[in-house]
């Protein structure tokens, strides 16, 4: 919302965005949501409450496939809600999964579960009469959707690599602690959705403030050498540093100010890699997390939401100034960055044995969409059947995939046989398909300008043909497609990134790398799928013939001069 409101009489202070007024007048996120729930004349919420329900983990959407048809029939759009669960670190138990699966089948328009790039799941197509029911179900399961959207700290993600399960457990515990510590303290969620007793007017938000944050805030924890969480896509990232003598994490490198969204036509917006602040000990993580959040709370831009993210605050005030303020407020000094190396960002598919002698099976879930829509791939049914017999846990990855975790040696065959029976495991999936992902886009995302999730599978097939033509079947290029420039599928950290411009047309970005530490550059703007395929055929052919040993596609297109590397996106992204 770009409207402004006058918050004071000092004409030297910029007007605040209207979102700030909505938050300020919401009575700690209550607004008139409860009254709107009882309004049966519309399937949605009014404009202000549609903003506030985001803080409760929901987005108001409509089915864009039927928008014109319904308008012709003089009907309002098919308004529905998308709910995103809070699931720090992406761990969910089989019995929780079964209940979610059953609810999605019975009470959503689409009957699917969507795994996200932030290690959680979304339910699309929730109608207003079912909203209280889904929140009550989550509460019964020990889950909620608090702060998975809105101007707050979002779902905290961490490396899901089961190969180092001792380290994974440590970062998962930390992810849960950070998530809980930074949650809104308002009782509005329980009052509205769980019919909890209304509290007296004693709400306060000592960390987030009564107007919460200027914009959404994202936190990730990575365990090198795996960068599956894409540390440079987050406002705040912790990179684990392991003891040389034990399987214990002794501290973290801290990165601040990453973010990938931009606005077409506005060169003051751009994707930005995070800045290295320094190394801290494990005991200081919560204090640093709180302080980075509060500095951004106080210094972030509340007048122009396009410039409200942490990355723009760092650009405006300077990295050194922001870092010094964090040290001053927290009393924690940053030490020099400890050495670390990222070598990969993908998931390890198939069976992997953990150090506790249990096994972990990583399943490829194309675009994270779990459904029974394909009769040859009954993902929903197969995973539900496994949940009925599995005594371990499920882990959702930041690459939209699913890990069946904690499987005993005796149960491996039974679980794998079940998954093969329903087509969940397919040995023919190529490395290229496994390295590709897309955001949801049409028909439910209101921001989508072009297809993404529904476009990607057939597009990947065409890329597979190109790879095969040049005998690159065993190789993979990090490919990401988003329906708009917000980069929910992290296209601005891919080797090949497509961002939607209009139906059937995309911007093509090249030159990111395969470990997520370089932003790609715009190669061609507003082009068709055929244009994209022709460009990729040519550049992949050259890569096959001219590459150095083990050189990735992204590194090749930079070295060969097809695109210039983005070094400092604040200055050279639009060159």
Swiss-Prot record:
GO CC terms, sorted: sulfite reductase complex (NADPH)
Entry-linked Pfam families: NIR_SIR, NIR_SIR_ferr
GO molecular function terms noted in the UniProt entry: 4 iron, 4 sulfur cluster binding; heme binding; metal ion binding; NADP binding; sulfite reductase (ferredoxin) activity; sulfite reductase (NADPH) activity
Superkingdom of the source species: Bacteria
Gene3D superfamilies linked: Sulfite Reductase Hemoprotein, domain 1
Enzyme class: oxidoreductase
SUPFAM superfamilies per UniProt: Nitrite and sulphite reductase 4Fe-4S domain-like, Nitrite/Sulfite reductase N-terminal domain-like
Keyword Lipid biosynthesis: no
Pathway it works in: Sulfur metabolism; hydrogen sulfide biosynthesis; hydrogen sulfide from sulfite (NADPH route): step 1/1
Protein's GO biological process: cysteine biosynthetic process; hydrogen sulfide biosynthetic process; sulfate assimilation
Residues engaged in binding [4Fe-4S] cluster: 439, 445, 484, 488
EC number assigned by the record: 1.8.1.2
The family this protein is said to belong to: Belongs to the nitrite and sulfite reductase 4Fe-4S domain family.
Quaternary structure, from the entry: Alpha(8)-beta(8). The alpha component is a flavoprotein, the beta component is a hemoprotein.
HAMAP family in the cross-refs: CysI
Protein name: Sulfite reductase [NADPH] hemoprotein beta-component
The organism of origin for this protein: Blochmanniella pennsylvanica (strain BPEN)
Name of the gene this protein is made from: cysI
């Amino acid at each position: 919302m770009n409207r402004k409101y006058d918050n004071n009489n000092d004409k030297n202070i910029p007007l605040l965005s209207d979102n700030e007024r909505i938050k300020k007048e919401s009575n700690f996120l209550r607004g008139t949501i409860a009254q709107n729930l009882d309004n049966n004349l519309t399937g949605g919420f009014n404009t202000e409450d549609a903003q506030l329900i985001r803080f409760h983990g929901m987005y108001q959407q409509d089915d864009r496939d039927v928008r014109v048809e319904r308008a012709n029939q003089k009907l309002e759009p098919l308004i529905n809600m998308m709910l995103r669960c809070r699931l720090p670190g992406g761990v969910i138990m089989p019995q929780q999964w079964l209940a979610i699966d059953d609810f999605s089948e019975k009470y959503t328009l689409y009957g699917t579960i969507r795994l996200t790039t932030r290690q959680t799941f979304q339910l699309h197509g929730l109608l207003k009469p079912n909203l209280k029911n889904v929140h009550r179900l989550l509460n019964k399961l020990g889950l909620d959707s608090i702060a998975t959207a809105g101007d707050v700290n979002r779902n905290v993600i961490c490396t899901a690599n089961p190969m180092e399960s001792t380290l994974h457990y440590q970062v998962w515990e930390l992810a849960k602690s950070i998530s809980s510590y930074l949650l809104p303290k308002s009782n509005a969620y329980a009052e509205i959705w769980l019919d909890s007793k209304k509290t007296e007017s004693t709400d306060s938000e000592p960390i987030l403030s009564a107007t919460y944050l200027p914009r959404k805030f994202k936190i990730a924890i990575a365990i090198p050498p795996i960068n599956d969480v894409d540390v440079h896509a987050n406002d705040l990232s912790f990179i684990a540093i392991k003891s040389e003598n034990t399987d214990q994490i002794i501290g973290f490198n801290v990165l601040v100010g990453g973010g990938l969204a931009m606005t077409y036509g506005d060169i003051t917006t751009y994707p930005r890699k995070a800045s290295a602040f320094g190394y801290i000990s494990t005991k200081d993580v919560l204090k640093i997390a709180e302080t980075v959040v509060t500095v951004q709370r106080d210094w972030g831009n509340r007048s122009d939401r396009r410039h409200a993210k942490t990355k723009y605050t760092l650009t405006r005030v300077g990295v050194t100034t922001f870092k010094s303020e964090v040290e001053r407020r927290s009393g924690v000094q940053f030490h020099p960055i400890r050495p670390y190396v990222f070598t990969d960002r993908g998931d390890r598919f198939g069976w992997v044995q953990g150090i506790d002698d249990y096994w972990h099976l990583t399943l490829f879930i194309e675009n994270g969409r779990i459904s029974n829509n394909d009769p040859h791939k009954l993902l929903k049914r197969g995973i539900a059947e496994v949940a009925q017999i599995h005594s371990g846990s499920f882990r959702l990855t930041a690459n939209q995939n699913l890990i069946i975790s904690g499987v005993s040696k005796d149960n491996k065959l039974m679980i794998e046989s079940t998954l093969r029976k329903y087509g969940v495991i397919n040995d023919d999936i190529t490395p290229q398909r496994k390295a590709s992902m897309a955001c949801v886009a049409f028909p439910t995302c209101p921001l989508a300008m072009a297809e993404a999730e529904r476009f990607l599978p057939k597009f990947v097939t065409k890329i597979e043909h190109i790879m095969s033509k040049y005998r690159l079947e065993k190789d993979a290029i990090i490919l990401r497609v988003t329906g708009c420039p917000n980069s929910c599928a992290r296209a601005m950290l891919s080797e090949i990134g497509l961002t939607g411009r209009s139906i059937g047309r995309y911007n093509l970005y090249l030159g990111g790398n395969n470990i997520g530490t370089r932003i790609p550059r715009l190669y061609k703007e507003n082009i068709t799928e055929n244009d994209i395929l022709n460009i990729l055929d040519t550049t992949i052919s050259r890569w096959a013939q001219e590459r150095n040993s083990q050189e990735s596609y992204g590194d090749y297109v930079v070295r060969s001069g097809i695109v210039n590397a983005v070094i400092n996106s604040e200055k050279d992204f639009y060159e």
